[in-house]
Amino acid sequence: MSSIVINVAPAGSKVFKQLQWNRVHIKKSLDEICHSLTLELPISQKDLLHKHDTIEVRFYNKHITHNNGNLRVTTVRIDEITDTTDSGRKYITVLGRSPARDIIDSTWTGTTESATLLQVAETIAKGSFGIEVQHLPRGVDYTETIPVFAWDCESPWTQLVNAAENQGYVFTSNEAGELYLTKSGRDASQWHFILAEGMNIKSVETTESGAEQFHEYIVVSSGLEGRAIDPLCNNKRILTLNLSDFKLDQEKVNRRAQIELYRRRRRTTTVTVSGWGLTDAQIKSFETTHEKELFFNPNFLIPVYIPSAGLDCTMMISEVEYRAESSVFDCTISLVNPEVYMGKEGTVFKDKKSGLKGKQKTGFNAFIEEVEQRQKAAK
């Protein structure tokens, strides 16, 4: 049995107090560096929290073998508190974002020279705001050197995200409110994540949008020009990106143009599942949960089997929305083709099947059986 505990600490403090709460909604997305939180609490909790306080959401499960059986799901700073009376019912709503909000919202002037992408991020995040930046895998720095990184009376965040994308990296907030810098696409099958119709999927929705799609993509940098043509958008729409702040070679400007094409062409499959990640049975099956991922997270590459949508492949999680009310919780997961964030390197996953096609069993028992088979194969 799992449960959710929500705590609050005053700004600048690490002394947390537990809150009573009615419902919680957490959103994590590859397109937004910060996690966002919407939290509804009884009016009795109003005096316990204030703007800029820190809120953490923790997931408790008796099968978690480390950290006293609980893990953080997110850590945010409070942006807004609203007191509401509705048909005699009184409650407060709290909105919050990850600590990286301070980098995004702040504007100042600075420069770094001859530093790697990781070092630049550390200078900005840790040096100015005390936010740790961890490269995944840990203990190494595979990022490339940026000759000059400068910003003037602005937030450096957009430049930093562009610099990461130029190198095939992505920034994400982690559960503790720090930042991860990792290559696009993390293999989640190693922790036995899987999404399959008839097993753990409650509903499926597929969306195709052309609002941000163009026929021609042009990326300009240091006198070089990269182009990509989308034959599936047969019109005169053109998008030009000026990345003159970065000295990109021809390969990189071509890659950026191609990634813009894939991203704006995207077809999103959204599924709803019970819980926020692995089932109790899956968590219990690990000898230790230390260094294991237990929650669905953006940037995961995950086996997907949804015959009704014509899907039997590996897809990337672009967004997760967790919801909970008392003891009931579920989540909505947005899936895209890996090339949307990985470029051509991600196209190989369209042929990486789930291994479920043709199997007759359905339901939870089949789900557990499939997980057990994957675990045996991994040993």
Model-inferred region functions:
Residues M1-T109, N166-G168, S189, F193-T206:
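Assembly/oligomerization scaffold segments
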Residues K17-L19, S128-E132, A309:
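Short secondary-structure junctions
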Residues I33-L37, Y91-V94, E208-I218, C331-P338:
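Short, surface-exposed secondary-structure junctions/capping segments
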Residues L37-P42, V94, L179-L181, V271-V273, ...:
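Generic recognition of long tandem-repeat/solenoid scaffolds
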Residues D86-S209, E372-K379:
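Charged- and aromatic-enriched interaction segments used to assemble
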Residues G88-S106, S327-T347:
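Short solvent-exposed strand/turn elements
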Residues L39, I124, I317:
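Terminal peptide-recognition signature
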